[in-house]
Amino acid sequence: MRHSNSGKKLGRTPSHRKALFRNLAKALLTHGKIRTTEIKAKELRRVVEPLITLALRNDLHARRQAYSVLGSHQLVKRLFDEIGPAFVGVPGGYTRVVKLGQPRRGDCAPLAIIEFTRTVAASEAAAAPAEAE
């Protein structure tokens, strides 16, 4: 029986799933929006939205909890200094999943874009490689 077992397994082991969502969360916080499969995008909300709620608390314990998920001091700083203040006064729903019309070529997986509902300034780390090209 599947009582109280929420979340999709995505055909991965628990450690692989945890690493996948950590990496997707890092990419979303860095770039502001990412393209992935629809199911991964919907499950990613369960990781990212609590992180933004932590950023709204903005205390030392919240920073340490965010670091335990992200593992990067630069991303934690960006989360608390840039992304969090953009959502002050918003009671939830920090991300938006937009379904794309074309499925992924090869396996026909439905694709989606996950992005923040409020505009967050692009980080210098994400902008630097774009300028170098």
Curated annotation (Swiss-Prot):
The record's Gene Ontology biological-process terms are: translation
A GO CC term? cytosolic large ribosomal subunit
Similarity comment text for this entry: Belongs to the bacterial ribosomal protein bL17 family.
A Pfam family that the UniProt record links to this protein: Ribosomal_L17
Please name the InterPro entries in this protein's record: Ribosomal_bL17, Ribosomal_bL17_sf
Classification of source organism:
Bacteria, Pseudomonadati, Thermodesulfobacteriota, Desulfovibrionia, Desulfovibrionales
Q: Subunit info?
A: Part of the 50S ribosomal subunit. Contacts protein L32.
What's the name of its gene?
rplQ
Question: What's one GO MF term for it?
Answer: structural constituent of ribosome
Name recorded for this polypeptide: Large ribosomal subunit protein bL17
User: PANTHER family given for it?
Assistant: LARGE RIBOSOMAL SUBUNIT PROTEIN BL17M, RIBOSOMAL PROTEIN L17
Which keywords are on file for this protein? Ribonucleoprotein, Ribosomal protein
